[in-house]
Amino acid sequence: MAINIFHLNKHIGKQHVLKDICLSIGDGEVVGLLGPNGAGKSTLMKIMVGVWEGENGKGKGENENFVLQVPKSIGFLPEQNPLYEDMYVREYLRFFVGIRTNRQSPISHSQLVEDLITRVGLTAEANKRVGQLSKGYKQRVGLAQAMISNPELLILDEPTTGLDPNQLEDIRALIREMGKERTVILSTHILQEVKQMCSRVVIIDHGEIKVDKPIAEIDNLEETFKQATNNE
């Protein structure tokens, strides 16, 4: 299912953090969401997954009402992903599989857990407590959790922040693999990451979309980003 957002606005207190956002994303696209801190990237993602509600623009015509069309099945990895660190990895995933799926059989629950563990490369860590894991492996747990419902849309907010170079490449490889089967939207501060993983880039600054182009049409992403964000 395609994603369509029309005339999305959002205020937090007196601050207008998203301003008339219009965005359409086709099936199977991997979209990199770029922007400075506070640009509105995380707010947009939280509205897409239903954590926050969007708003109509003030004083706009009837034909400019806010519209949000997204798949029902969405996996979300927030930037600050709270994990139950006292639980073992396998136990943790089994807990969330039980909450998020309609499968009645404990056997099918267990099989899904094992499939997720294998898919994200947690086999050797499955019997460790989540709190014992490195940040890279904790991100794998978060990705497995986001994939429980085999979502049509995967939304990842800063999925590689704070990872060392080896962990970074491992997580990028996982995201590339997951992007072969679904639409992915990821936010990042790393321009090279967008070049490597994304088919399209959307740059947001001060709550507005400044650039929305296929990555193949951008000759110099660094320069495009600087111009879009007035960053000298």
Predicted features and spans:
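Helical segment within the ABC ATPase nucleotide-binding domain
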Residues: 168-180
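Conserved structural motif at the start of ABC-family nucleotide-binding domains
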Residues: 3-5, 18
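Conserved ABC ATPase signature
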Residues: 129-136
